[in-house]
């Protein structure tokens, strides 16, 4: 709800400045309800974890909060990436996922089904990979499940440049025209990328009909109508006063605090300031803003790293020593240094901390 409110407020401000560029709309490509079972997958932090049922329940709550239950949607949510997309990142543009029907139905589809049936999610984003030989953004099987079995009524969008992958990675088509036609003919209404610039030529060549193109356009305009973009709505007066308001920050802090699971403590937490003299913080994320925001982030007025948070809490009475220790993925923090050159610093911080 907070995300949708602030999104509407920013949208209203952008419209006043006639700014309708990328990332300025009301269709939010979230949540990511892919199943995260391999920690090497670089986008796992976007997901709700390894459990299909829990992922579906959390995703359903997110979609309901984002879209609201008023006369108009406050924002349009998007369940992604449909389907069987959980890495590997390096191969996703050519990879063919071939799960058993049991694994498909029990692992990879339940969360999407819940978001369609229980939350009425407005948008589905197709994945880069193929599923059983068919590209996810041009799949008879996936569309028959999505619209035929589940009754999905919203619009379907490709992941960015996924349709180009048809002829450059998956090699299921030979030209951009063929790729555009295959996608539209199989229910992909919107292309994130440039391949749909070839739709007119594909139509002229008889690869896709005007009826199919009209069907796709109608679904996209239906989303706009549901958002109230052609009418006056209850959200039109939301202003920048909503952005990072005290209430919203408090709700964000509460949600973050309630998400923590403390697996082991040994009497360390909560920190007792009166008994501490020196604290050591060791690791590449000790003072990293990137670790806080991840990818696809907005602009916050203030970021509080682990180091800064401890300094704020402990004040001047407790020394806070920090060492990066190592890089996230390389063997050195700085290019000109020797491998593991920060280890001695990390040891010193540890030795001189309580």
Residue positions per predicted region:
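Glycoside hydrolase catalytic-domain context in secreted enzymes
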Residues: 1-354
